[in-house]
Amino acid sequence: MRKTVLIVKSALEQFRIPFYSRLAKAFESDGVDLRVLVPPDALAKHQPLPEESPAGLFVPVGTRRFQFGARRLTYQRIGRSADSADLVIVQQSAAELTNYLLFARRTWKRYRLAFWGHGHNFQESLRSRPGECLKKSLSKRVDYWFAYNHVSADIVRRLPYPAERICVVNNSIDTEGARAQWNSITPQETAETRRSLGIPADHPVVVYCGAFYKAKMLDFLVESVTRARRTQPLHLVVIGDGPGNRILLDFEKQNAEWVHLVGARYGRDKARYFRLANLCLLPGAVGLAIVDAMAYETPLLTTRSRDHGPEIGYLEQGENGWMTDCSIEDYADAIGLLLRDHDTRGRLAQGCRRTATQITLANMVERFRQGVRSALQMPPLGISAEADAAFCEQQ
């Protein structure tokens, strides 16, 4: 008998679409039907979907959002869809009101309920004690866990939670595709990109790639790069956008000769700018952008910020990236050191290449697939296999 697995998401990120599509195809031979339930407006933003996305994979469900000060809550009407599912995977979040309904309904519907998430809120500035306490309590009651990587898995184990019910996903993007795009950029294209930005051929380039908000430490970035440029004729290329863009817009206006904001870029267009870069600067809140840097063989320089996501666990100091204290002086010195030291930078680039071949989308799909198999085979948490089998026979 075929099994049905639901993934419930209150957002649909562009970089996740290839993952869901490949996971659905991998499930075909396992007798598993995958459905990803998302808000209609989130799905509409990505139309038309890529050809590789199977028909019916993404299902729009009614969604309501509530704002209470800085707190945003989401409710998705998925009750009956879950009733016929064998496994429901939801975000580990106290702000997803749907989760509470799913916890209540599984008492008599007996679908397995799994969390997919970080383990806790890694951004200290956004962490609330009541929210984290509630999240911790719920995290110990799901039937299975899909942890972003080993950092998240360690947090979940310490809740405590049974290690045999945790799948370490190794959160990633399509690194193979990103590397293919990066490798396809010709020297002529790179030279033309330099010319279009007014960057001399012998001037080093550092790139920032990510969103613009407080935890990204944009003020810190501006001051550090300004300090580093006193000893290096470097140029800063900024890829991204967000609510904190005023800081960088003003910075570019004052330093138009060497600061270049190019906006949000994707795919091969983004790879084109990384081809210029000697270093990737992300002083605060490192997330999946570290995987971009690895795929593009561009060593990441960051700090010991308390706002990093679990993906910071992919960084190996002195092997594939570099981390300093949260000091503008230390960070600026590290920029200068790594731009001057070609041997160290070359070694870090090799480490990036090695890591990029391990943290791949294909591996993430296979890990998630194996995790779903395990979750479907295990009885619900706290229920014996015999009792679970007896319940299933009655349905």
Predicted regions and their residues:
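Short hydrophobic beta-strand element within catalytic cores of glycosyltransferases
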Residues: 299-308
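Conserved donor-binding/catalytic core segment of Leloir-type glycosyltransferases
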Residues: 6, 188, 194, 199-216, ...
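Conserved acidic donor-binding segment of nucleotide-sugar-dependent glycosyltransferases
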Residues: 303, 317-328, 337-343
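Nucleotide-activated donor-binding/catalytic signature segment of Leloir-type glycosyltransferases, i.e.
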Residues: 246-268
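A short, well-ordered alpha-helix in the C-terminal region of glycosyltransferases
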Residues: 195, 337, 344-358
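Acidic donor-binding loop of glycosyltransferase active sites
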Residues: 275-285, 298-299
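A short, histidine- and acid-enriched strand-loop-helix "catalytic/donor-clamping" loop
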Residues: 97, 111-129, 141-144
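Donor nucleotide-sugar binding/catalytic pocket of nucleotide-sugar-dependent glycosyltransferases
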Residues: 140-192, 382
